[in-house]
């Protein structure tokens, strides 16, 4: 990949094999960047050994498992082509509660990286452990409205969904009624939700 400057340092032109993930095509091309934004992409003649492609998005990660704070994780991730991440900080939240969420979000702002944080849905993870914190449905309803939280993270409590635990149902109602996204980690379980007036009914289908 080559890089040339035009019209001063504010405009760059990159040449290489462009990976078009939407058209499922790879072709020699030229990408023009001005003031940090792509202004044009076009085909050109030539042969290149390098590739130009969108950055990867890590769709689900617990950064705590890397034993690094977000800013350090970002440095390592970018070197491997990852430019954004959807984060579920439930490990640190089970120890420190809301303080842990705030730490992860505040630290992530130190990095030039697209961090997106979801709100842990199972704190504690199960009813059979001694955790450092608890986040119930009422707290969930308050936290999920924050601008720096994009939705409710993985619902790991499959029994709580199947047997309609009141706290679990309230948490899922909160995210659905506010049109936030949610993720699930319930093996062999399909969850569907149907809004009926002011209430939300959940149907669980074990497979």
Task: List each language-model region with its residue ranges.
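N-terminal metal-binding scaffold of metallo-dependent hydrolase/deaminase domains
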Residues: 1-46
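The start of beta-strands in P-loop NTPase/AAA+ ATPase cores
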Residues: 10-11, 29, 53-55, 186
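Active-site regions of enzymes building and remodeling cell-envelope glycoconjugates
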Residues: 44-49, 200-201
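Di-metal (Zn2+ and/or Mg2+/Mn2+) metal-binding site signature of metallo-dependent hydrolases
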Residues: 50-73
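A cross-domain feature marking catalytic cores of carbohydrate-active enzymes
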Residues: 61-63, 88-89, 117-121, 154-156, ...
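Histidine/acidic-residue-rich catalytic or RNA/ligand-binding cores of hydrolases
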Residues: 69-70, 98, 164-165, 190-199
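Divalent-metal coordination cores built from histidine and acidic residues
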Residues: 74-179
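Functional cores that coordinate and move charged inorganic groups
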Residues: 169-207
């Amino acid at each position: 990949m080559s890089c040339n400057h035009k019209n001063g340092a504010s405009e760059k032109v990159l040449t290489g094999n462009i990976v078009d993930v939407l058209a499922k095509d790879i072709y020699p091309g030229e990408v023009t960047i001005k003031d940090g934004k792509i202004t044009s992409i076009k085909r050109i003649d030539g042969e290149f050994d390098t590739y130009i492609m969108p950055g990867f998005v890590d769709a689900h990660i617990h950064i705590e498992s890397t034993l690094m704070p977000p800013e350090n994780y970002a440095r390592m991730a970018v070197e491997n082509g990852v430019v954004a991440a959807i984060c579920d900080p439930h490990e640190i939240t089970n120890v420190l509660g809301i303080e842990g969420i705030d730490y992860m979000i505040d630290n992530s702002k130190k990095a030039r990286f697209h961090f997106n944080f979801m709100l842990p849905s199972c704190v504690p993870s199960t009813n059979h452990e001694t955790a450092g914190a608890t986040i119930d449905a009422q707290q969930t309803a308050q936290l999920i409205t924050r601008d720096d939280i994009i939705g409710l993270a993985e619902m790991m409590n499959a029994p709580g969904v199947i047997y309609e635990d009141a706290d679990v149902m309230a948490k899922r109602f909160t995210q659905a009624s506010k049109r936030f996204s949610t993720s699930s980690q319930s093996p062999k379980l399909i969850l569907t939700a149907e809004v009926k007036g002011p209430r939300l009914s959940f149907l669980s289908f074990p497979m």
